[in-house]
Amino acid sequence: MTAMNTTPPTPSPASHFDAAARDWDQRPTSQQLAAVAPRLLAQLPLSPTDQVLDFGAGTGLLATQIAPLVAQVTALDTSAAMLEVLQAKGHANITTHCGDVFAGLPGRYHAIVSCMALHHVANTAALLRAFADALHPGGRIALVDLYLEDGSFHGDNAAKGVHHFGFAPDTLQALAEQAGLQGIAFTEVLRMHRSNGREYPLFLMTGHKP
């Protein structure tokens, strides 16, 4: 008789975020990240006719700030509960889409934005190729994530679906250029304070599709 495996299954990243969705906006991390949107928008030209994809949109940290400036925002995330919180905010021109980026994106975009989602995707090269394919010619990216760190930012990395402990700009730039993106530039956009007493810098990576 085969012994039963009593090891509890590791929760999926989506289930982690589903469980956290209700009070996500009130968490210290989210309140610090609220400073990102205006700094990102200062470096991302947008027009009232633009279609924008917010990758890893969560409860709408970026989407809700971008929506008044453009025609439509598609908020993509794997957590249905996070997107439900976003929907409840009542922005008529934000469409939510729960699914995997590699299952196909629901449109073409003039800009793709993201905040603290890249490190949740194992294959960064494939992700950047998907972004490039989904952009109109001349379309722009504005992506925020951690500079390289030692894994202490999240702590419980497996439970939270963390595949990368931040990124080295030169490595990320090379992958973006291989995906067909140009004009890649990095600026430090925020320093986050964590309960372990440390600060972690975040970058804003910008670029465009020729």
Regions found by a protein language model. Give the residues of each.
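A short glycine-rich, Lys/Arg-flanked "PGG" loop and its adjoining helix->strand segment in the class I
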Residues: 126-137
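C-terminal alpha-helical "lid/dimerization" subdomain adjacent to the S-adenosyl-L-methionine
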Residues: 8-12, 27-31, 62, 142-199
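Conserved class I S-adenosyl-L-methionine
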Residues: 2-46, 61-62, 85, 190
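Short glycine-centered segments of the SAM/dcSAM-binding site in methyltransferase folds
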Residues: 51, 139-140
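C-terminal lobe and adjacent flexible extensions of AdoMet/dcAdoMet transferase-like proteins
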Residues: 205-210
